[in-house]
Amino acid sequence: MSINVTEIVLHQLQQTAGETAELHTVLREDLLAISPEVEQMMLQLHQAYQNKAKAYGIFQSESIFAQQLNRLLEGESEFLPFSHSCAKMLATELVKYPFASGGTFILCRYTFLATEYLFIALIDSRASMLVDDKLEVKRTEYLDITQYDIACRINLTELKHNAQSNRYLTFIKGRVGRKVADFFMDFLGAEEGLNPQVQNQTLLQAVSDYCEQGELDSNQTQAVKKQVFEYCKGQINSGEEIAISELSASMPTLKEIDFADFAEQQEYGLEESIPPVRNALKTLTKYSGSGKGVTISFDAELLSQRIIWDELNDTLTIKGLPANLRDQLERNK
């Protein structure tokens, strides 16, 4: 797969020494020349971004960033001054947070698989060693383009054709204890858009309700849920979203209504396609839970067969322990 870089520029955000944290911007005065090395770097950044956990956002009506982006897309401004303004706004927002640090600011407009994107990231540098042509060991620094968590991407194609979309903007979810998502929302002048977790949970509820209205017994219901899970797992493995129409076609029609029509009639608010969330979808075929030093996970089809739930006494009875668990118990009795 190839990537077509249209415009790209690098700037530096440098943290100044002293008691009060400040970020100083070092701005390029021209765009980077587009070379095979530049395109290879952007391809790696694109691929790394694809594999990261992301949240969705939309621009607020008063977003300064969105206003400047619109002028760029309308041809009223150039990419370089736009990038200068972005770097300064990013530094202004980032310095408000305790994790503020410098890095290389990358702003790139590119096309991948007929979709145009604007990619924005702050990349850390890492120290390493190299051996030169005289076999001398020297210290060097390199851009850590696979490990980064301050980045966002705007789907310009979708933004141009559907400004009311709730998913044209994505950004990397921050690590626990870091409000990366918060500062990026402030920098972009954005608010939460599509919530994949909520959409996945709503999908699971819709599937359960569909089976219930179809008057399926527990075994039939579990068979349908397994079908749904297999389709969703295939979408995850191929990097695709859950298409409700495709999912519906893979499911049985119950009471003369297919799943897609049922979901629409019941007004669940499902999108036509949903980014899959693996952990949420696992509950289609598994029961799991942990607490008070106990962790339990088992296939849903085992309930009422090898796993017996006594709701009144709040107990689970397991018939036929896993061999490795039984061995551990015997060794430590």
From Swiss-Prot:
InterPro entries: Nucleoid_associated_NdpA. It holds the Pfam family NA37. The keyword Cytoplasm applies. One of its GO terms (molecular function) is single-stranded RNA binding. GO terms for cellular component: bacterial nucleoid; cytoplasm. It comes from Glaesserella parasuis serovar 5 (strain SH0165). This is Nucleoid-associated protein HAPS_0704. It comes from the Bacteria. The keyword Cytoplasm applies.
